[in-house]
């Protein structure tokens, strides 16, 4: 018996049902890689960030997340080069979906119990997404803005429902505004740390502040 279509599991009807010691035998999620491109690029190399934002409360299958990841990656590699971007899938499929298998062969009515004991077996995993939640983010150089929008537009077709593309006012994957970021780095209030930054507050030990500004 093949996989049931994802439209059967589109809506969030039940409570979250994750893999646990009570819910065993769950198949592995199709999506295994959540970061692609130049993951180790320093925070100051990729200032532009684009998000795909969900406009519905629904469930997205791990197969759909994998298809969208491949689609966005293929377009970005072709248009910006394999080292010109960093894609991050922001959803993880933890919710387990079930199927109550029905026999369709001749004489099935004598073998199966119908809706008696209908709690199904695990079939796959989905990610539950809320309105306004980010599904996928891409950071890159400022001149690649149109390519980011097009890559996310193509990836949107892999998902049900409605999504919006949003170009962030923040710097890369950080939470600091792009127009203030460089000034904060110059004042040593932010210290680059891989693809993120460390925020140095105004309060704290004076020795640390002196060591930074010496």
UniProtKB/Swiss-Prot annotation:
One Gene Ontology term of the molecular function aspect: structural constituent of ribosome
Citrulline modifications at: 32
GO biological process assignments: embryonic brain development; regulation of translation; translation
UniProt-annotated location(s): Cytoplasm
Highest taxon of source: Eukaryota
Signal peptide coordinates: none
Alphabetic keyword roster: Citrullination, Cytoplasm, Developmental protein, Isopeptide bond, Ribonucleoprotein, Ribosomal protein, Ubl conjugation
PTMs per UniProt: Citrullinated by PADI4.
Record-listed cross-link Glycyl lysine isopeptide (Lys-Gly) (interchain with G-Cter in ubiquitin), residues: 188
Entries under PROSITE patterns matching the protein: RIBOSOMAL_L10E (PS01257)
GO cellular component terms listed in the entry, alphabetical order: cytoplasmic side of rough endoplasmic reticulum membrane; cytosolic large ribosomal subunit; large ribosomal subunit
Positions bearing the Glycyl lysine isopeptide (Lys-Gly) (interchain with G-Cter in SUMO2) cross-link: 175
Family in the record: Belongs to the universal ribosomal protein uL16 family.
Subunit structure: Component of the large ribosomal subunit. Mature ribosomes consist of a small (40S) and a large (60S) subunit. The 40S subunit contains about 33 different proteins and 1 molecule of RNA (18S). The 60S subunit contains about 49 different proteins and 3 molecules of RNA (28S, 5.8S and 5S).
Protein function: Component of the large ribosomal subunit. Plays a role in the formation of actively translating ribosomes. May play a role in the embryonic brain development.
Protein name stated in the entry: Large ribosomal subunit protein uL16
UniProt organism field: Sus scrofa
Encoding gene, per UniProt annotation: RPL10
